[in-house]
Regions:
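Transmembrane-helix signature of 12-pass secondary carriers
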Residues: 1-175
Length: 175
């Protein structure tokens, strides 16, 4: 009976449309991930004025997402080994997208901070999983290049957040 080494097949594969699809979806998720993290900085001046926040309070409010990211990475990284990467990524995307949308309905800093923390769980949880997914499917010769391209989406998301904020914030407000 012949044995098949799946890792060897993946490592030696030629870059093909399947790899493009994995790269596209992972990069798109990272773009939204970057957008969701940076959007706080875009609305920060308005929030400070509207809620009369001191710089210290505003900084603390912003750090809740970072605490969530740390916890999310530690929770969803290992969890994906049990439930699968796609399920873990889906849960994380729902968390960071849903709670970022809910942030728009926050009426006070406490509600906003809770939403930022929970969104941070998804933001941090998606990171190790898209890296692992891209690494697992990428041919060995271009693995680090594909991960680097995918991660550049994080900066793209941040720039989109700032660019859209410049256009939308003056016309529609932060909510």
């Amino acid at each position: 009976m012949q044995k098949i080494d799946a890792n060897k097949i993946i490592d030696e594969a030629k870059f093909n449309p399947f790899h493009w699809m994995v790269l596209f979806w992972c990069a798109l998720i990272i773009i939204f991930d970057g957008y969701d993290l940076v959007i706080y900085g875009v609305v920060l001046p308005v929030l400070m004025k509207e809620w009369n926040l001191s710089p210290l309070e505003a900084g603390a409010l912003g750090s809740y997402a970072l605490f969530g990211m740390m916890a999310g990475a530690l929770i969803f990284g290992p969890l994906s080994d049990k439930i699968g990467r796609k399920k873990a990524i889906t849960i994380c995307v729902v968390l960071f997208s849903g709670f970022t949308v809910l942030n728009g309905f926050a009426t006070n800093p406490t509600e906003f901070g809770i939403c930022r923390f929970i969104a941070g769980l998804g933001i941090g949880g998606v990171m190790p999983n898209v890296v692992a997914l891209m690494s697992e499917y990428a041919p060995k010769k271009i693995r680090s290049t594909l991960v680097a391209i995918m991660f550049s989406g994080y900066s793209v998301g941040g720039m989109l957040s700032a660019g859209l904020g410049i256009v939308l914030l003056p016309n529609f407000g932060w909510q």
